[in-house]
Curated annotation (Swiss-Prot):
PROSITE patterns: FLAVODOXIN_LIKE (PS50902). Binds 1 FMN per monomer. NAD(+) binds at residue 12. The keyword NADP applies. One of its GO terms (molecular function) is NADP binding. It catalyses: a quinone + NADH + H(+) = a quinol + NAD(+); a quinone + NADPH + H(+) = a quinol + NADP(+). This is NAD(P)H dehydrogenase (quinone). It is an enzyme of class 1 (oxidoreductase). It comes from the Bacteria. Gene3D superfamilies: 3.40.50.360. Its cofactor is FMN. Belongs to the WrbA family.
Amino acid sequence: MTKVLVLYYSAYGHIEAMANAVAEGAREAGVTVDIKRVPELVPAEVAKASYYKVDQAAPIAKIEDLTNYDAIIVGTGTRFGRMGSQMANFLDQAGGLWAKGALHGKVGGAFTSSATQHGGQETTLFSIITNLLHFGMVVVGMNYGFAGQMKLDEVTGGAPYGATTITGGDGSRQPSANELAGARYQGRQIAETARKLHG
């Protein structure tokens, strides 16, 4: 059976919620889905003082896990217009897999969050997608079959490059129903593509 990994980093729970929605969508395609997160790099006392959400249910991923999946969907919050250092650090450890071509032909995708509408979501998606392309993966975005990314009657994330959410400057805004629907749509699209390519 086709296997999909939703790999994420979430400091405050927004990307965790998006990861769960991506996984729900992937499961709709009839594939096996695992959700894992990358290790935290921030010292525990700093994470506590900054109110990081440290009680996340997803297990910690190991770099060798990546070879076990037909599709890998990567999510992380935006940090100054690029992926967070926790995810970058994890992907930087994939040099051995890259050298062996171990990820060639796997399907990949990206999702993210930012504090504001113009807070670097697309550049962050591209920073993730660049890694996936270097790994030899087939990248699937969030196409315009998801009409929710065209909405003008509400503040909403979403781009053809991947699902996104807007958190607000203080992080109080949680992913909207429309943003979660976009995440589910992208998860399903990636899973269906992986199933077609890998059976």
